[in-house]
Amino acid sequence: MAQGQEVKKITIDGMEYAINDPAAALKNLPAKLVARIKMYDDKSEEAKFSGYDDGSKSRTLNIETRNPNQMKVFGRGELASGLEKVKDKSYSASVSLNLFDRKRKITFSGNAGRMALNDLPDARYRDEGNKNKNHGLWGNYSSQINKKLQVSGNYRWNANVNNSASLSRQEYLPTGNYESRVYDNESHSNSDNQSHGVNFSLDYKINDKNRIRFNPDFTISRGNQESLSWNSSMENGDTLNRTETKAINKNDSKRAGGNFSWMHAFKRQDVP
């Protein structure tokens, strides 16, 4: 978001970057490398080619880097680990590497994390022990191949595993109807999700009157969710009822889309 409006496109030194993922561009670019930021409403490619304003605009952020003609190599890495005495310690790690010059922008970044807690000591079921994991990779390549051809694309991968468990007990004070009454509940929830995504853009200026643009995108995702609950009630030491519920849900999806356009500028004729 910028000035209350969603940013649709990011350019760095005038070159398109991080297609359909502007947040990634801002996350990987250090502030000390930025010379100037310009926000504007960019016309559609068809409008810029034809010179006719079709009214279609997208909020665009252009980032000008310091010394744009120089090759710049920069990155960062972070690592943190927990000290708790658990079987699998918690950790968090991230790394990024960038190579920038006037005609080419290359970025790679990755992250991994795990948060682990002690197992519930009195649980009937054993699972991942309240362990949550997240992993991700992201890469971008943008290049002005020559005066006619410009390409840009990125790949992203995300994987998340989330597990949780809880135990609860309710004990009621004695009454004339019973000496003791106890309700026990145990619940577990596990999910495993993964996704891959690719965005690509090709812009080829055949000549002054013809131009081709191709923008495909692909997404593949899968997910598994499982939940388990166990409930029981006892009165005066005798079991009144016991229930166990288990649910499993799996989903897989594949999506492909994009657009192809061939723009041609016809010769203008004066209307008499």
Residue ranges and their predicted role:
Residues 1-228, 245-272:
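Membrane-proximal, glycine/serine-rich, low-complexity loop/turn segments characteristic
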Residues 175-176, 232-242:
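Solvent-exposed loop segments that connect transmembrane elements
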